[in-house]
Amino acid sequence: QDAFQLGGSSFAQTQNKIGTEVPTIKDADCFKRAFNTIQTLILDNQILAGHDIGSGGLITTLLEMCFADVDLGANIDLTVFEEKDVVKVLFAENIGIVMQAKDDSVFESTLNNNNIPFYKLGTVTTTDNLQLTADNSQPSTVNIQLSTYRDIWFETSYLLDQKQTQHHQATARFE
């Protein structure tokens, strides 16, 4: 429910900036309702997959969700957001969760009944592709080949893991 702010984000850090405006929780009651509603949806087995939007923003969340399997991709429609600056939409670290619903109608009615704002972003595919459609002054589509970025992601994670754990444990997780 907050504007897409890049202050304090990983993206801002890559630009050697800190920023002055950061995302925040504007409505604590809504946050609490969302948390409790998601717990209910989990108990009712209505969530197939989920990931918080945190460090790295929405793009990192989408990539990490797709990295879970080699035949897992998504078609995402970013035009559902009022914000037209695609960089802000993808890299702002606003509080949020991306979830894959078991049954869209049950999921959506549960969120609506609990007054939880949400966006339907797209669909899961069985491809090696994350397709992002945006409207940043004119419609455009970007296709990301997931296998390329998955390899980079896991290699980087492995190198970091080596510094944080015993070498053989990092190697076992990587292989």
Where are these regions (language model features)?
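Short, surface-exposed beta-edge/turn micro-motifs
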Residues: 94-96
